Every structure is written in C-alpha cells, then in structure tokens.
C-alpha cells in the first residue's frame, strides 16, 4: 500500500502449534533522501499478499509511561550495525533485555522506531515501569527519541520499583 508494508510472522513448534505471532508495519524509505517512497512493483511481488492473522493488533504508537528515568548511556558498536549502516532493529531489543530482571517473564514485545542510530553515536537509555509494563526510550544526546521498546511481563516474584 503506497509506502507502507504490513507483515505477519508465525513461529510454530514441532507439533504445529503457534508459539509466537507477530505483526509489523514498515515504511519503504529512499535511503538517499530518507523519505517514504512508493513500493516498487518488483518489491511488492516478492512479498505476496495474504489474509491478516487472527490475533490482537496493538496500536501503532506506544503510549509512554510518564516517569522515565535515565539509567545508562551506550555507544553504538560496529556489531550492532546492519546492511543499511544503522543500528539493527534486533539490537534495540537485545540492549533493552540487558536491563530486564530474570524474574520477569516476557509475554509481549513491542517496538516503535522513529529514527536510526549509526555507529559511534551515544544512546541515552531511559526506563519506566508500571504494573506489567516495562518501557525503554532510546534517545540521542539532544533528547530526541529514536526508539521505544516495551515489554509486557508476568511478574514472577519481584517487587515493582
């Protein structure tokens, strides 16, 4: 659809039961101008259309918990860079997981990417918790949010801070 792509992903166990379901929305961006562009027909044919999976679809934007606290600063390292020369989407999740207690059983992961980090940039990491949610904001040194990661958890013995 125009410059937007939608993808469902299912991972099944050996018996065929769904163990992970995911939905994602993507913007097709011109890497030179960093502007959305219409999806080219040959790209569209590489991803055939299918029916949406029956599942809960979260809103596109993550509503932030109000009291975010800075917990760390990190530099983007070469191994976190993908083929587009920016921080790989998975690296944001892996980084957030470093600040999650092993007592938290993660039930859902959401992420909202606003602008990519590149090698050598400083990531200001902020964290907030409320009930069963743990959120991270990855911002630049000017305070601009680049990515939000949210975990929905089941508490397994730890107290909320």
For each feature predicted by the language model, list its residue ranges.
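Short coil/loop residues immediately preceding or within conserved phosphate-binding loops
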Residues: 6, 71, 108
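HotDog/MaoC-like acyl-thioester-processing domains
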Residues: 1-60, 114-119, 128-161
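A conserved acidic, glycine/proline-rich C-terminal tail/linker
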Residues: 102-127
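Active-site helix/loop of acyl-thioester processing domains in fatty-acid/polyketide metabolism
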Residues: 88-106
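A short, structural micro-pattern
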Residues: 18-21, 68, 105
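Short amphipathic
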Residues: 66-78
């Amino acid at each position: 659809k125009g410059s937007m792509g939608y993808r469902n992903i299912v991972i099944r166990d050996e018996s065929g039961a769904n163990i992970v379901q995911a939905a994602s929305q993507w913007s097709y961006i011109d890497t030179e101008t960093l502007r959305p562009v219409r999806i080219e027909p040959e790209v569209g044919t590489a991803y055939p259309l299918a029916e949406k999976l029956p599942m809960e679809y979260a809103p596109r934007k993550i509503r932030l918990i109000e009291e975010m606290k800075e917990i760390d600063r990190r530099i983007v390292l070469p191994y976190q860079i993908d083929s587009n020369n920016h921080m790989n989407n998975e690296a944001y999740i892996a980084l957030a997981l470093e600040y999650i207690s092993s007592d938290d059983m993660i039930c859902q992961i959401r992420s909202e990417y606003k602008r990519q980090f590149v090698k050598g940039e400083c990531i200001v990491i902020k964290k907030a918790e409320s009930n069963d949610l743990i959120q991270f904001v990855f911002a630049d040194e000017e305070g601009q949010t680049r990515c939000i990661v949210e975990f929905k958890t089941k508490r397994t013995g730890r107290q909320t801070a």
